[in-house]
Amino acid sequence: MTSRRSQEKSYAEAAAAPPPKESASSDVTPAVPADVIYKLLGFTAAMVVGPIGMYFVTVNSGGMSFFHQTSNFSLFETLTRIASPTVAGITAAITANLVLFGYIYVAWLDDREEREAASKRNEKKAQ
């Protein structure tokens, strides 16, 4: 009993063959719009530069030095100088959270605009 080999291409032949030509109406638009990428890059830069910059600005300014302009109370000045890295860390954390909330808000606005545009298109199709 001999079995006949099918006339179809083998796996190696199929893999080596060029892909079948697609129609000219294929969709070549990017999966993510460019403005979304630019916003993401901007917020990424803000997330890196903002908190680190605020940390060093706050550390170098002496923490809460604006509370004791011309005070002779040296204990308060000593405590604010000691707490300066702590205050700077808190400032950096607040800055990071503000950038994060800003990104979430901008993404929410973009999503809302897309939903409104989609609902308008659906209303036009229904008419």
Curated annotation (Swiss-Prot):
Whether Repeat counts among this entry's keywords is: no
- Source organism, top-level taxon: Eukaryota
**UniProt keyword list:** Cytoplasmic vesicle, Endoplasmic reticulum, Membrane, Transmembrane, Transmembrane helix
Report whether Endoplasmic reticulum shows up as a keyword of the record. yes
- Where do Low complexity bias regions lie? 12-26
- In which broad location class does this protein mainly occur, judging by the first location in its UniProt entry? endoplasmic reticulum
Lumenal membrane side:
61-88
List the transmembrane segments.
40-60, 89-109
Q: Where is this region: Disordered?
A: 1-28
How does this protein sit in the membrane? Multi-pass membrane protein
Q: State its location(s).
A: Endoplasmic reticulum membrane; Endoplasmic reticulum-Golgi intermediate compartment membrane; Cytoplasmic vesicle, COPII-coated vesicle membrane
Question: Biased composition, Basic and acidic residues: where in the chain?
Answer: 1-11
Spell out the InterPro entries in the cross-references: Vma21
Family annotation (Pfam families): VMA21
Q: Which family does it belong to?
A: Belongs to the VMA21 family.
| PANTHER family assigned | VACUOLAR ATPASE ASSEMBLY INTEGRAL MEMBRANE PROTEIN VMA21
Provide the function of this protein. Required for the assembly of the V0 complex of the vacuolar ATPase (V-ATPase) in the endoplasmic reticulum.
**What protein name does the entry list?**
Vacuolar ATPase assembly integral membrane protein vma21
